[in-house]
Amino acid sequence: MKKAGRPVGNKAASGGGKGDSVTAGNCAGKNTVKSPTSAPLSKVKSNDDLLAAMAGSSAGTNNSVAKGKKSTSTHSTSCGTNTNNPDTKTKTTSGPSGKRTTSMTSKESNSSRERLRNSRNSSSKKQSSTGASDRAQPKHSRALAQTSDSESRMSKSKSDGQLSDKVALEAKVKNLLGLAKSKDVEILQLRGELRDMRVQLGLPEEDEEEERPPEREAAAVITAADVESTLLLLQEQNQAIRGELNLLKNENRMLKDRLNALGFSLEQRLDGADKTFGFPSTSPELSSGGAGAHGDCATVASSVEGSAPGSMEDLLTGGQRSGSTDNLDSESSEVYQAVTSSDDALDAPSGCGSSSSSESEGGPPACRSSSRKGSSGNTSEVSVACLTERIHQMEENQHSTSEELQATLQELADLQQITQELNGENERLGEEKVLLMDSLCQQSDKLEHCGRQIEYFRSLLDEHGVAYSVDEDIKSGRYMELEQRYVELAENARFEREQLLGVQQHLSNTLKMAEQDNAEAQNVIAALKERNHHMERLLDVERQERASMAAVLEECKAAVNNDQAELSRCRVLLEQERQKVAELYSIHNAGDKSDIHQLLEGVRLDKEEAEAKASKLQDDLGHARSEVACLQDTLNKLDAEYRDFQSVVQKELAEQKRAIEKQREDLQEKETEIGDMKETIFELEDEVEQHRAVKLHDNLIISDLENSMKKLQDQKHDMEREIKILHRRLREESAEWRQFQADLQTAVVIANDIKSEAQEEIGDLRRRLQEAQEKNEKLGKEIEEVKNRKQDEERGRVYNYMNAVERDLAALRQGMGLSRRPSTSSEPSPTVKTLIKSFDSASQGPGANATAVAAAAAAAAAAAAVTVTSTTPTAPLPRTPLSPSPMKTPPAAAVSPIQRHSITGSMAAAKPLSSLADKRPSYTDISMPAEHLLRAANSRPASALQRVSNMDTSKTITVSRRSSEEPKRDISTPDGGPASSLISMSSAAALSSSSSPTASVNPTARSRLREERKDPLSALAREYGGSKRNALLRWCQKKTEGYQNIDITNFSSSWNDGLAFCAVLHTYLPAHIPYQELNSQDKRRNFTLAFQAAESVGIKSTLDITDMVHTERPDWQSVMTYVTSIYKYFET
């Protein structure tokens, strides 16, 4: 990207004065009008921000300048945070606060401009009026003073306006420079994303290095005259940015075309995303306006929906999905998200840029303002929401990928340990196989010796005419009687146990109810006692109050008595004084008047004092009487209340006593019932113990009877086997060699067919391998980092399969090559030699001896039709994840048609998605009996060769039958021909070697059963393919299909609301979980219902409800362990 970085000169340094400042102000006004010409700077969805910043930066006050600086600082801070996180594609917008700030500053700037314009007009009017008044009336000095004041104010306002315009222009230039830097950061982010997409797609990086943008020289002082040159500089930078964006758009379209060529259906995904979010189509050809935000939403929808048909996963697996290809599909969908989002984000501003350029060239200001208002709001909000959703989706993908990687590492460690165990088991099985072959030879010799003894004993019995038939009816009747008796005893014991359990449960329930009633009665008694104590306390309080009132009453009575005594004394004194007055009157009448006057005065004073005392005492007496009356009324009231309260308390006490007596009686009855129940429980427990002892004794008797019955059955089977062997040897001694010869011919022909089929499969595999390699090479050039590990795994599996097939063919060649040794048999067969030679020649060159092979095949088919009359055709198995073609007849059919039938049954009984590696041990089990047969043919006489070869063949047949889990003991018809003889021989050999622990089950089936018993997810991984974690995840997705609000993509965040657990358990236990009533908000209820439903069937909860409720991403291993336990309980 090229940018023009011109140094900004200080043009206004030489000039000064009012003229320059006025000119600068006019220029600033012009530049303010021309400010929409800088609209091409909005190439990356920032046209609204630029215009808002330009409008907001022209404020005329210091507050508006401060606000503009604050918005600029927040904008630069957001840009810095965006440069620190280049992976997240967030746009550098100043946010809603910045928009509100710019809108406020724009309003303030408009209002300041209007005030400035009005002040200038008013000042000019005042100046003209004052000039006229000076010329007309030079007398008025006051008018002159006003004119000078107005001139000074006008000059001051002009200077203030010029300064405010200068500061506003400087802030505007700073905002424009900050926006240009933010656009540089956005373009660098787009470049980094393009580079990441190239790395993810495996494209070679371009050798040519783009020119680094030169740093701008910071201007020390930016004056108002520099705004026009700065705008021109920004226009040139916008042109450079436009060219760079066009270049990036072309590169993105080229990448999109390549992705379309690779099979990514971009239009279908975009249409699906538009339908999902309700947006118009955002194809590259029709992208305009706010298509960037729509593109982001579309990519989010596509990432949620997953990979569509025809994606990279379909190209790699050909319709079979596995865990490894799931990783590839998720990564390719992430690549597609990056491409589409960047392309749509670049397509969208092109339309905006063209419209803004057309508006700057000739559009009216109304159109510019309408476009500015229409484009702001939707793009920022929608883009922020879509980017937030996309970041959340990327975090989910990252967590899922890390979870899958951890699970894969754990499974790899488990597989390494299993491989070591299987290697040790394979060595042990090889040793056991050698021991079995030796024991087979010994058993065949022993069987031959026993046959001779039985023949001798039978000849003796025939000579003496002794009947040696076994009384089977009596034994069978006795056995049936014992079995019927055992069934009856078991039924009776079970019935009695259920009855005793029912009685015990009933008694325990009754005991619990009695205990509850007792507890309630005790509570009632305690409550009544507490109430009684409370009443007693109230009674004591009332008694104390009554005593205090009585004491107060006594005191009042004493005071009244004292007052009455004092009143009587006063009356006596009054009478005495009256007498004295009468005497004094008499003395006055008789004697000196002066003395009498003095005495009268003294007496009058005494009288007044006595009257005052009398009135005072009278008042005190009245008060005392009123108090006594009040106290008497109060005392009467208290007496009445006390009597009422006492009666109520006595009634309540009587009721409480009656209730307590009743409760005591009930308690005694309950205690007696509890004692009776305990005695009954003890008796029942004694009876249960007796029944258990009787049952144990009966079980011992039954086990003894079963052991004796098994012994009798073994003896019976031994006798039957010996009789069958004697019958076959007496009647079919001459036909055994012909039968063996026909079987050997059939075996050779079938081995040849198997070899040709194996070669065809190898050819098909090599052809498919070559095609896959070509396809992988073609795709590997474009997505190397994604494909390398998966391709190595596929190659390793294919190579392992080829090596296994080659090893199996080598074992077959080794087993069949031994037959070319010179035979020392007394009866050589030229037909067998001819077949062996034809087989060897067919192994060296399949096309050279086609006639001999066809003749051998026809002869073998005829022999098979003669010997075996009813055989089931081998059905081809379904395709496995590693096999390119349907599996044909397994090589285990190379021994005889009967063994072919048994192996066909075992393969049909096996699981349909089992791999070929699980069936490899059966190849070696085939080659050993033939080798042993040919070795025995070189060392033994003809009769021993016939017997031992038949026994070895029957031994292999028996092992294969037991591996197919369909044991057939008694398949024998005395007069059934050669086929029946072979079947009887096989059962006899199987029973004779039943002492060996490994002869009853095929090692492959045994190892598989042990593996499934240890790890229940092994069968699931074989069924779905891929790792165990992905297989269990797909099983959960399959079980929860059709459930709403369920999207299982991992084992952590997909299970944090409990609905996934409820959905999985609802498929098995619908009565325990009301799924329609659940929601994702009530997490605790969801987890509680799910865990209770699982515990009701015996699945122990290993998760804590509190941790699950409060954790956004629970431990995926714990969740996977719990889900595994659910799968193990319901599916295994």
From Swiss-Prot:
Pfam families in the cross-refs: CH
Listed Low complexity bias regions: 73-109, 119-129, 348-377, 979-1000
Keyword Membrane in annotation: no
Domain Calponin-homology (CH): 1026-1131
Biased composition (Polar residues): 333-343, 946-961
Gene Ontology CC entries for this record: cytoplasm; filamentous actin; gap junction; microtubule organizing center; spindle
InterPro entries linked: CH_dom, CH_dom_sf, F-actin_Monoox_Mical
Keyword match Cytoplasm: yes
Region (Disordered): 1-166, 301-381, 869-895, 939-1016
Alphabetical UniProt keywords: Cell cycle, Cell division, Cell junction, Coiled coil, Cytoplasm, Cytoskeleton, Gap junction
Listed Pro residues bias regions: 875-889
Biological-process GO terms, alphabetical: actin cytoskeleton organization; cell division; face morphogenesis
Task performed by this protein: Involved in cytokinesis and spindle organization. May play a role in actin cytoskeleton organization and microtubule stabilization and hence required for proper cell adhesion and migration.
Record's subunit section: May interact with both microtubules and actin cytoskeleton.
UniProt protein name: Cytospin-A
Origin species: Danio rerio (Zebrafish)
Gene name of the record: specc1la
